[in-house]
Amino acid sequence: NFPVAVWAWNAALAWVCGDSVIWKPSEKTPLTALACHHVFGEACRRFHAQTGIETSGLSEVLIGGRDVGEALVADPRVALISATGSVPMGRTVARRVAARLGRCLLELGGNNAMIVRPSADLDLATMAIVFSAAGTAGQRCTTLRRLIVDPSIKDALIERVAHAFGQLT
């Protein structure tokens, strides 16, 4: 998953609402979180210097494994948990947060599909399919994984998509 994007979307919403953010990144991508935290901290220092408005405590990063995530999920002071991961992880988080009447926002393992109907512009559909499946080398949760194609255009679309993928370098 692209760790900065999901954090940035959710953090921006929290800050607009006047809430602070605790980011517990995947233990596989801690440097991304630390770099973002550094940049955000510098922006806060400049904002404070220009306005006098205090910004401390708006963002914290916790580095650790599953135990750190579980502690955040269990803590009633954490009003909302936003988690990205597998469906089994999401089910566990949802149950634990619900047990304390908290809220959660879950982005779980997707299986994204594209539907191609007979009325589709096949050139445009081909470009969309190739970009959706290969645009980020498959390294995002929104990567196209399945095609649902009307049988009347299946052969023509397969030929176009195969040719397009053959052009990738």
Stretches with model-predicted labels:
Residues N1-R45, L101:
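Conserved small-residue-rich beta-alpha loop and adjacent elements
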Residues N1-F2, I63-A71, G85-T92, R96:
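Beta-loop-alpha module in the N-terminal Rossmann-like domain of NAD(P)-dependent dehydrogenases
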Residues A11-A12, G69, G90, T126:
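Generic hydrophobic/aromatic pocket-lining and core-packing "Φ" positions
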Residues H48-E54, S59-S82:
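A structured beta-alpha segment of the ubiquitous adenosine-cofactor-binding alpha/beta core
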Residues A8-W9, L34-A35, V73, T92-R96, ...:
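Short amphipathic alpha-helical segments
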Residues E42-A43, L80, P88-T169:
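ALDH superfamily catalytic-core signature
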